[in-house]
Amino acid sequence: MMSNRSDFIVPDEAAVKRAASVNFHLEPLRPWLDDPQITEVCVNRPGEVFCERASAWEYYAVPNLDYEHLISLGTATARFVDQDISDSRPVLSAILPMGERIQIVRPPACEHGTISVTIRKPSFTRRTLEDYAQQGFFKHVRPMSKSLTPFEQELLALKEAGDYMSFLRRAVQLERVIVVAGETGSGKTTLMKALMQEIPFDQRLITIEDVPELFLPDHPNHVHLFYPSEAKEEENAPVTAATLLRSCLRMKPTRILLAELRGGETYDFINVAASGHGGSITSCHAGSCELTFERLALMVLQNRQGRQLPYEIIRRLLYLVVDVVVHVHNGVHDGTGRHISEVWYDPNTKRALSLQHSEKAQ
């Protein structure tokens, strides 16, 4: 019996051509896309590729991967998924023909003359619980405890001893979330850049700012993202600090460095920090360490989703997520100049809040 022609799915010729165009533009990356040991393929700028293998980054020079080719890859990918990527919509999230997830950022949302491409390869690895047990997966589970960890005790001892340089250095190395607060002209950005120098050079860093200030000459695996200073999430601007924060989650950052918290993007920053991306550093305007938490809470309330949360919940989240607040001041009138006036670090309060929530949940 002959089957009815309607039983067959006729391939869409146009879709096949669009997929072929994407695959053609991916050819310079094919050696790493086809390598089963590589999980992530990143292009930060023309001519260079960073790949993640066994949780370590590898660098490769690819001279034929020029700017025009990367622009064409973005255009082909956008057509394949029936989306747009352009100067007015410079961020694209998509799934490639072979199932890889891709994130593309082009100018003006990144540095002029560069394009950021992040490709995450799907994992086909299957493990049983027995496999996990043999690999020691369950050997390091720590029960909830009121006791501080050795690292927390170390940081607290440095702070109480007044060794603030060593305290800040270790806080960065231990991937604590740090907020630098102070008034305009107090030196927040300059201190942020000093803290960034303590980040290990092999980590992948992504900065978000409206004006290029957070330079990373010693960290080769980095991407600088930019948003217009007048862009507002509430007005549905295509590129804002908040949209770039969300984009970061698809770009495999080790750390996210946001130049300044000014409004509703604070909600997204807290979300990102709470999702396990430790080591983030940012700044805000505030008159003291305690007022920093008030300012952050008020800025969370400027977000559509954030304002749905009770103020007490927002404050609690901030104390759980933010590890260190450094307040800087410019003593113009008393002649003290720019200096750190306060440092907040209170792991005991953080632990108590966490345990309190855990006990209520039980």
Curated annotation (Swiss-Prot):
Taking the first listed entry, what is the main subcellular location of this protein, grouped into a coarse class?
Answer: cytoplasm
Origin: domain of life: Bacteria
Record's GO cellular component terms: cytoplasm; type IV secretion system complex
One biological process term from GO is: secretion by the type IV secretion system
Compartment annotation: Cytoplasm
What are the recorded GO MF terms, alphabetically? Answer: ATP binding; ATP hydrolysis activity
**Residues where ATP binds:** G182, E183, T184, G185, S186, G187, K188, T189
Pfam assignment, any one = T2SSE
The residues forming a coiled coil are none
Asked if the keyword Transmembrane helix belongs to this entry, the reply reads no
Keywords, sorted A to Z:
ATP-binding, Cytoplasm, Nucleotide-binding, Virulence
Under the heading InterPro entries, the entry gives: P-loop_NTPase, Sigma_54_int_dom_ATP-bd_1, T2SS/T4SS_dom, T4SS_GSP_E_ATPase, VirB11
**NCBIfam families in the record, alphabetically?**
VirB11
Of which family is this protein a member? Belongs to the GSP E family.
Protein name per UniProt: Type IV secretion system protein VirB11
In which organism is this protein found?
A: Brucella melitensis biotype 1 (strain ATCC 23456 / CCUG 17765 / NCTC 10094 / 16M)
